Amino acid sequence: MKIAQIQMHVSADKAENIRHACDLVRSAGDIDLAVLPEMFCCPYDNACFRDYGEPFAGPAQRAMSQLARERGIYLIAGSLPELEGHRVYNTSFVYAPDGTCIARHRKIHLFDIDVEGGQRFMESEVLSPGREVTTFDTPWGTMGLCICFDMRFQELCRLMALRGARVIFAPAAFNMTTAPAHWKILFRQRAVDQQCFTVGTSPARDKTASYVAWGHSIVCDPWSRVIRQCPSREAVAVTELDLSMVDSVRRQLPILSARREDVYRLTEL
């Protein structure tokens, strides 16, 4: 399975962001799946989310559907602000090669942090949380999907793995405070926990932005090896995933099958 991570520069011009995302996906060539970063068409700023938001089947989503159909690929459209009534969600839409929307993930764990001497951000001041674990089916098997801060919650990723997820995709805009300490180790740890590939796709770093993303989009294999990491600048990274590794690692080190459900149990509500 060949994937492309689109680590793109995000500007204040929504229409230009959409055009740029389409151009970068086209530049990836012959791929099976592309993934865009968190808030790919909107500055990562509470002051922007509602103004840049759109309802289901809005203009950014229509463009992504058309792009998936044009390229004949699966497309994880990073995330964007989704409007529903008075609520705003941080939402990732997934499109099949025929342009059909086959999955929607609304960020479950909102990014509310206040690090002494570092980053402060309160998504909950504007955004509402999602309530559903998200997986989707492809010819290569089941894929899991979460957004940024969701990736810190092992329980959520375990539920995806128990559904059969072979890859966990996370569009993610980590920042200059948390990412140097946690970005690489977090994606490696989720790969260890769930014995699957983990794919983190960031916006490119823009030092002039109000919120500065880390960049360094990453892919880890089921043995927790980093097999791809981008620089901080804009990049299109194409990686071939050997999904037979998932079965091999789970067979050799049977963590999922060795769980003691007579002692403890993780349930999905």
Where are these regions (language model features)?
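Extreme N-terminal starter segment of soluble prokaryotic enzymes
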Residues: 1-4
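Cys-nucleophile CN-hydrolase/nitrilase-fold catalytic domain and related Cys-dependent amidase chemistry
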Residues: 14, 22-104, 113, 174-196
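CN hydrolase (nitrilase-like) catalytic-core segments centered on the catalytic cysteine
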Residues: 56-76, 142, 151-237
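Short polar catalytic/cofactor-binding loops
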Residues: 7-13
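Active-site catalytic loop in hydrolytic enzyme cores
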Residues: 83-163, 176-185, 252-255
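Short beta-strand-to-turn element immediately C-terminal to the catalytic PLP-Schiff-base lysine
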Residues: 95-97, 220-221, 239-240
